[in-house]
Design a protein with these regions (language model features):
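Short helix-adjacent coil turns
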Residues: 95-102
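Glycine-rich, acidic and aromatic/proline-enriched surface loops and short helix-turn segments
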Residues: 51, 112-120
């Protein structure tokens, strides 16, 4: 029996999303509401990818070595990729335990934060308004994140990820290597690991470049803190019943001392 009507209504990726949302060993009810969420996710992934690639992110922008990590001169970009490195570790661990529903949940949560917060914060830099170095930094962050997200989402949304992959990468996303976040190593250990695994992927250590690994947790927190401030500004505009694009003359942000 083939559910043609459901597939035509929501798409194959959306139906697969619903199936993947079920916990291993648990009974799962037929739920078109979950399919609607899956369809929305697939469409958003498609549109967000178009936007990122139209900004100028290319395959060459993807960070695959420690040396390339030095292009990341903006703390917000470094924060995003530090969080990405930990997402890869967490999603991989979930898959290894056959907890694919959890892997989907954490990837989806990261993706919505990426599109709703990070992408909204970097548009001026992406268009070159703050100079070439800032533009190169943000394009590297965008390309590296998109590259990893397509690989992570491929088991759940195989058709839309394959379509997006074909826009800027050769071959098939389903034959591409699984993204890997390197262990946080220091000095010669990191150099040795990098030499043996030249295409292993982005790591939190690479994002920090020459910084102390102890700073990683603080670095990870930058993006959510900025996103929280952005959310406060959005709420203030909504409460004032003005358009979101209305300029803010001034804002006071209270935060604990670093």
């Amino acid at each position: 029996m083939v559910p043609n009507e459901v597939l035509e209504k929501y798409g194959s990726d959306a139906v697969r999303y619903w199936a993947a949302s079920a916990r291993l060993g648990a009974d799962t009810a037929y739920d078109e509401g979950q399919m609607k969420i899956g369809r929305r996710l697939a469409i958003k992934l498609l549109n967000a990818s178009k936007f990122v690639l139209n900004l100028g992110a290319t395959e060459k922008s993807v960070i695959t070595s420690q040396a390339q990590g030095h292009v990341l001169i903006n703390a917000l970009d470094r924060s995003l990729l530090a969080r990405l490195a930990y997402l890869i570790e967490e999603a991989t661990a979930a898959f290894e335990k056959y907890e694919y529903a959890r892997a989907l949940q954490i990837c989806e949560s990261f993706f919505w934060s990426f599109t709703d917060d990070f992408v909204e914060l970097i548009k001026d830099r992406a268009y070159g308004a703050r100079g070439e170095q800032e533009q190169a930094s943000v394009l590297a962050a965008l390309a590296t994140t998109l590259d990893a997200l397509l690989r992570l989402f491929a088991p759940f949304l195989p058709f839309v990820t394959e379509e997006i992959w074909s826009w800027w990468r050769a071959g098939s996303v389903h034959r591409a290597e699984w993204p890997q976040a390197l262990p946080i190593l220091e000095g010669t250990l990191l150099a040795e690991y990098s030499a043996q695994n030249p295409t292993a992927g982005i790591s939190a250590q690479w994002v920090l470049a020459d910084a102390d690994p102890a700073q990683i947790e603080s670095l990870k927190q930058i993006l959510p803190d900025v996103a929280e401030a952005l959310g406060g500004l959005r709420k203030a505009k909504s409460d004032a019943k003005v358009k979101q694009r209305t300029e803010v003359e001034s804002a006071t942000i209270a935060a604990p001392q670093a």
